[in-house]
Amino acid sequence: MQHLVLPRSCIFVKMRGINRLKTWTGMVLMALLLGGCTPPDDPVVPMVPPSQVYLEVPSSFPRPDFPEDNAFDDVRWTLGKALFFDARLSLDGAVSCGSCHLPSRAFAAPEAVTPGAFGTTGNRNSSTLTNVAYQPYFMSEGGVPSLEMQVLVPLQEPSEMAHNVVTVCEELAAEYEAQSMAAYGRSLDPFVLTRALATFERSLLSGTSAWDAWQAGGATDPSVIRGAELFGGSGLGCNRCHAPPLFTSHWFANNGLDDWSEDPGRWRITGAPEDSGAFKIPTLRNIGFTAPYMHDGRFSDLDAVLDHYEVGGAGHAHQDSLLVPFSLTEDERTDLKMFLLALNDSAFVQDERWMQ
C-alpha cells in the first residue's frame, strides 16, 4: 500500500456519497475572488497586544506551527470560538461546527453520521478534532492541505452546512465587526472566517491523559501496562499505525472493511486502485469519548472494533498487509481496552475554555 502525501495543488472536497464526487477547486477560487480571501498588502496586526492565554501546549508536545498570516493570539481565538458555535454558518441556521464536534465527546459526535442542514445525512462519521493542529492534511481521504482551507468544506458541503462562505460573511459581518477588526484589522470575510476558525481548532490540544502521566513517571494500573505491551512492544504492533505520542501516523490505510463502494476514500485523490477503501489513520487519543468508530461510524464500541481486527478484517481486496488474524484471551482483551481508555483526557473534554 502506498502512503502518499497530497500535493498542495490537488484539492478535493469530502463528498459524503460517491454520486457527488467532484473537485471543489472552483468553489475555493470563487470564495477567494469574491470574498476578498487574499491577505492585505501589509501584514495584519491585531489592534490589541497579542496574548496567548488560550493556547496551552502539553509539556510533551511541540508547539504547533501557525501560518505566517494567521499567528495565534487570544483575540483571534475568541472570534474563532464564537464562529465555531454559531449555527448561522449553516443555511438553515440549525447546525454549527459544534453540532458535529462536541467538546464533551472530544470534538466528535455520538451518532454514526450526524445530520446536517435540513436533516440531510451523508456517509461519514464526524472525526475528533483532538490535536488537529498537528495534522499535515485534512479530511479522511487527505484531500485538503490546510486547516484554513478545510473550513470551507463542511460550510459549503450540501449534506453538512449547505451554505456559501461569501453569503455567510455578508450576513454576519455587522455583528462580528468589532471582533473581526480587533483580530485581523478587517471586516468579516472569507479570509477572516477561515483563519479565525482554524485558530480556535489549533488550540484543541490533548495531552494530559493517564497514559501521559504514566509516561512522565507516575503510577498506573498493571492492566494498563500489560495492555501497552500488547499494543506495541512484542505484542500486536498496533503502534505501527497508531504511533505515540499522537497515536496516529497520519498515513492512509485500508483496514479491511467490507463495504467501501459508496466511499472509496483515498482513491478519490490518487485514482490508484490500491487506494480504494483507504482512509487517514485516526488518532486513538480520547478513544473512550469518540464512539462510534470507523470512517462511517459502523462500530458502536471497542469490542466491535477488536472483533473486526481479531479476525484480520473482512477480506477487502486492497486491505493493508498488516492486518492479520490474532487471538486474545479475555484477560488480554481487558488489558488492551484498559490501555486504550488510559488515552482518555478528562481534563480536555471538561475544559472550560470550550464551554459556550
Residue ranges, per PLM feature:
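Bacterial N-terminal signal peptides that target proteins for export
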Residues: 4-6, 15-26
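Enrichment for repetitive, rod-forming helical segments
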Residues: 15, 29-31, 340
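Periplasmic c-type cytochrome electron-transfer domains
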Residues: 37-356
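Bacterial N-terminal signal peptides
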Residues: 24-35
